[in-house]
Amino acid sequence: MQESNFIHITAGIAQVIEAEEKLLSRLPVEVITQRRNRQNRTIKQILGHLIDSASNNHQRMVRLQYSKDLLFFPDYTQDNDLWIALQDYQNADWSNLIQLWKCYNLHIIQVINSVDKNRLDSYWCDFTGAKVTLREMIEGLSLIHI
């Protein structure tokens, strides 16, 4: 097994958090609640979706380090809009959302820094049946999707 150092990934996440937290906190209410992307999501809903992504990644990273069984996780990608609606991100407190997003991603850094290197080849199967290793998950974290 090759040795892995994920410092470039964790440093990148930290840089995104530092830059984006400042930007997000300065956005006016009308921008975060009315401006929509091509999926018809507001900025509040997009940030909520990023929190959901972090929570799903967190669950996978931790479970892959101890599970002895093959793991199958639900297909979160098909349920994004449902997750956003059920959690009512549109009406959530903006400052709380920013802090939750920040803290969850800081915790992801902690999880990555503490990962059991002997478990990097542990894998789960996505909804298509494709195998995804812990190493691939970490290396595949997109800084534009933090």
Task: Label the model's feature ranges.
Residues 144-146:
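Conserved small/polar residues in nucleotide/adenosyl-binding loops
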Residues 1-9, 33, 56-101:
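Short, helix-capping/interhelical loops that line the mouth of catalytic, cofactor-
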